[in-house]
UniProtKB/Swiss-Prot annotation:
PTM sites of type Phosphoserine: S89, S96, S137, S138, S142, S613
Binding annotation for Zn(2+) 1: C830, C833, C857, C860
Record-linked Pfam families: Myb_DNA-binding, ZZ
DNA-binding region: 687-710
Protein name from the UniProt record: ZZ-type zinc finger-containing protein 3
Residues involved in Zn(2+) 2 binding: C845, C848, H870, H874
Length: 910
């Protein structure tokens, strides 16, 4: 049988590849790297390559279809039966009525087209005739791509083998269940006439020497093949020989040795079954998808040069030519292509598979892709497969990295794979795309394939495709680990800016913080839209309140926005960033006692003193209005991080009120308990009683608070309800503090120690006018004079008479100052004599309205001047000092208060 293969191989031109070294009678040592650059060709059959046409994946010419008249009727019957009677798994749903009608329509069109086509007398090599006949064919008659024909060739062999009565094929059926359950069931059918063990060994050696990996040898060494005397169809050389005889004369004698007895097309191939991608499978998918989109000449040139050119050049050119390809493609064009595939099954019967093993693998992929699109026609969605730059760079740097497949269990696992499984892997990987869950069919599909079907593919596989082991099917554990690693590599954290420092770009805490900020900004935008929506619904409800109430009673959907779960800030371990003391911390290291009093002014708004921690137990009935972002990239045990409360670490051993400020209510209750529980010999017992009474503070916290409280009372001169502390210890310490600075007083929360102590307020209730018109020094003198008089005498009439004398004294002093000095009341005019400005004493009418009041000079104050508003009996008030315009912006502020708007404010002088 080997000699027959050799004689047939010598009779036709071919390229010498790893798969044809044994067939051409060459030595095994010839299989080196120089093998790719050598060829054995006969001058009578050398054909020149035509020019590469435009890259249009949808409009391509088709060769004149040829047909074998002897097999026309039989093939159409078999094809119609296969389209209707596909084997259905008991766990999958049957095809819908629309899908069945579509398949029947395709079958009828194929019958009509085959009857209308004549059968040529001579069968030529279609692969070489395509280029010559492409220009003579019209696009209306040939909407299908010519590179679909190798897939059709297998169907012809199936039809030939269907009539063979002497041999039965062994079929392995892969039942691919629902997409959610990745289960593979194997159904083995017994086979008559197993292989001879010697022939199996020889074929395995050929495949190994010719560059086909061990996984391809599993085609022969599978459990379906039983070694005995029948050599049947498993010899690769005889397979090719029989293939040529079928293509040449179409006699039924060669049908006994045809190896492709598969009913592969009879079942609906499920291209949507999810498959876990490994690195090898991803590269195979990228290469196939790119090849499917190339023009016919370019694709044939690539497949022809794959045996002679380096693998790395082909792979890099494919990846460079297409970085983004359309996976599904145009649904209408694919539909026509699939119909043409089913209508012309005999066209490819005249095409001979090359002995050198240069398969039209890309054509097969196109055919399978067209079938996939026709099955998914109700959902015409387009998806784009974007090649990851990292993956592309990896492929360019090491293109031959995957020449040998990944192994988990060694040769045992590879030999357990049947050729059916290898074909299944090919079909799944070709059609695999990022589809929607809704696009995945819910019914399981069945793939029935002959055990010897892949023998010729293993032989006819070029080196460029041999680098990707098609027969490799990784285990679930290996696939899951590779898939997880790929997700981690291809989906890095992108929450950083390009201008950030390198240390920040790869910092998980920084990325998590930016992610939280991004989510919060989105939630804020949504909240603004929700507020606008609420305002709109409010206006509509006010226009029709009765209808609005009726909708509420009927519980109808009004369209009100739903509340959001606000994302909380992530927990960050600040200890890893603040382990070493900086200059700022060294400077204020000795002032640590003041850190407990530090509180910003915006905390008075009502925010809790202690931030809500996710570690706090949730109360019953508490609405979960906050949510945390997932911490998938964080280290394990991140939820056990200790919490920081006001600069101090808090763990489970600390009380709930650890390092929290005392409220005003707690302080008042503490003062009451200090009076309730008198001092004891052992003060710790007193603190424990007070702590038990408070309920939320420990004895240690009470002792610390009472100590500070007593010091405050002692400094203020207020009696201490207990032992008086020694102020000498505390007075020795430096009193300079950031809190005492007048510029920092607004940054600190007022103390709660002296809440019950109310300082006295002194106010002159008899004469409010004196406070308005008198100088600040005069007001201070009056206050000091009144303080010298005891309170018990202030209600006597003598005290009131004394106050009147004081006022008269002040007026006389002011008059004397006015007469001795020259005073001009700028802006005031005498309403009687008309002198302007009034000099000396100005008399102002108190009874007239302020906007219409009259002013007189000192000489006209006694004249009986009357107007419509001013009467003679009105009371006049003397004004001794001129009221000039005073610009407060140029006055130095009194006291310790300040304003940044004051131009005279200089913080350096304070």
């Amino acid at each position: 049988m080997v000699g027959t293969c050799h004689s047939m191989a010598a009779s036709r031109s071919t390229r010498v590849t790893r798969s044809t070294v044994g067939l051409n009678g060459l030595d095994e040592s010839f299989c080196g790297r120089t093998l790719r650059n050598r060829s054995i060709a006969h001058p009578e059959e050398i054909s020149s390559h035509s020019q590469v046409r435009s890259r249009s994946p949808k409009k391509r010419a088709e060769p004149v279809p040829t047909q074998k008249g002897t097999n026309n009727g039989r093939t159409s019957d078999v094809r119609q039966q296969s389209a209707r009677d596909s084997w259905v798994s008991p766990r999958k749903r049957r095809l819908s009525s629309s899908e069945k009608d579509d398949l029947e329509r395709q079958a009828l069109e194929s019958c009509e087209r085959r009857q209308a086509e004549p059968a040529p007398p001579v069968f030529k090599n279609i692969k070489r005739c395509l280029r010559a006949e492409a220009t003579n064919s019209s696009e209306e008659d040939s909407p299908v791509k010519p590179d679909k024909e190798p897939g059709e060739h297998r169907r012809i062999v199936v039809d030939h083998d269907a009539d063979f009565q002497g041999a039965k094929r062994a079929c392995r059926c892969l039942i691919l269940d629902d997409c959610e359950k990745r289960e593979v069931k194997k159904v083995n059918v017994s086979e008559e006439g197993p292989l001879n063990a010697a022939v199996v060994e020889e074929i395995t050696g050929y495949l190994t020497v010719n560059g086909v990996d061990d996984s391809d040898s599993a085609v022969i060494n599978c459990d379906d093949c039983q070694p005995d005397g029948n050599t049947k169809q498993n010899n690769p050389g005889s397979c090719v020989l029989q293939e040529e005889s079928v293509a040449g004369d179409g006699d039924s004698e060669t049908q006994t040795s045809v190896f492709c007895g598969s009913r592969k097309e009879d079942s609906c191939i499920d291209h949507f079954v999810p498959c876990t991608k490994s690195d090898v499978q991803v590269k195979l998918e990228d290469h196939k998808l790119v090849t499917a989109c190339l023009p016919v000449e370019r694709r044939n040139q690539l497949t022809a040069e794959s045996a002679s050119g380096p693998v790395s050049e082909i792979q890099s050119s494919l990846r460079d030519s297409e970085e983004e390809v359309d996976v599904v493609g145009d649904s209408s064009a694919s539909k026509e292509q699939c119909n043409e595939n089913s209508s012309n099954p005999l066209d490819t019967g005249s095409e001979r598979m090359p002995v050198s093993g240069e398969p039209e693998l890309s054509s097969i992929l196109d055919c399978v892709s067209a079938q996939m699109t026709s099955l998914s026609e109700p959902q015409e969605h387009r998806y784009t497969l974007r090649t990851s730059p990292r993956r592309a760079a990896l492929a360019r740097s090491s293109p031959t990295k995957t020449t040998s497949p990944y192994r988990e269990n060694g040769q045992l696992e590879e030999t357990n794979l049947s050729p059916q499984e290898t074909n299944t892997t090919v079909s799944d990987h070709v059609s695999e795309s990022p589809t929607d869950p809704a696009e995945v069919p819910q019914d399981g599909k069945v793939l029935c394939c002959d055990s010897e079907n892949y023998g010729s593919e293993g032989l006819s596989k070029p080196p460029s495709e041999a680098r990707v082991n098609i027969g490799h099917l990784p285990s679930a554990k290996e696939s899951a680990s590779q898939h997880t690693a790929e997700e981690e590599d291809d989906d890095p954290d992108v929450y950083y800016f390009e201008s950030d420092h390198v240390a920040l770009k790869h910092n998980k805490d920084y990325q998590r913080l930016l992610q939280t900020i991004a989510v919060l900004e989105a939630q804020r935008s949504q909240a603004v839209q929700d507020l606008e929506s609420l305002g709109k619904h409010q206006r509509e409800a006010l226009k029709n309140p009765i209808g609005f109430v009726e909708k509420l009673q009927k519980k109808a959907d009004i369209g009100l926005p739903y509340p959001q779960r606000v994302v909380q800030l992530p927990e960050i371990m600040w200890d890893q960033y603040t382990n070493s003391l900086g200059n700022f911390e060294r400077e204020f290291k000795h002032r640590k006692r003041h850190t407990r009093r530090v509180k910003l002014v915006f905390d008075k708004v009502g925010l809790p003193a202690r931030p809500k921690s996710p570690l706090d137990p949730k109360k019953d009935g508490e609405s979960l209005s906050y949510s945390m972002l997932p911490l998938s990239d964080g280290p394990e045990g991140s939820h056990n991080r200790p919490q920081m409360i006001r600069g101090r670490l808090c763990d489970d051993s600390k009380p709930e009120t650890f390092n929290q400020l005392w409220t005003v209510e707690e302080q008042k209750k503490l003062e009451q308990l200090l009076l309730k529980y008198p001092p004891e010999e052992v003060e710790s017992r007193r603190w424990q009683k007070i702590a038990d009474e408070l309920g939320n503070r420990t004895a240690k916290q009470v002792a610390s608070r009472v100590q500070k409280y007593f010091i405050k009372l002692t400094k203020a001169g207020i009696p201490v309800p207990g032992r008086t502390p020694n102020l000498y210890i505390y007075s020795r310490k430096s009193s300079t503090s950031r809190r005492q600075h007048p510029l920092n007083k607004h940054l600190f929360k007022p103390s709660t120690f002296m809440t019950s102590h109310e300082p006295p307020v002194y106010m002159d209730e008899d004469d409010d006018r004196s406070c308005l018109h008198s100088h600040m020094s005069t007001a201070a003198e009056e206050a000091s004079d009144e303080e010298s008089i005891p309170i018990i005498y202030r209600s006597l009439p003598e005290y009131k008479e004394l106050l009147q004398f004081k006022k008269l004294k002040k007026q006389k002093l002011q008059q004397m100052q006015a007469e001795s000095g020259f005073v001009q009341h700028v802006g005031f005019k005498c309403d009687n004599c008309g002198v302007e400005p009034i000099q000396g004493v100005r008399w102002h009418c108190q009874d007239c309205p302020p906007e219409m009041s009259l002013d007189f000079c000192d000489s006209c104050s006694d004249c009986p001047h009357e107007t419509d508003i001013h009467k003679e009996d009105h009371q006049l008030e003397p004004v001794y000092k001129s009221e000039t315009f005073l610009d407060r912006d140029y006055c130095v502020s009194q006291g310790t208060s300040y304003s940044y708007l004051d131009p005279n404010y200089f913080p350096a002088n304070r």
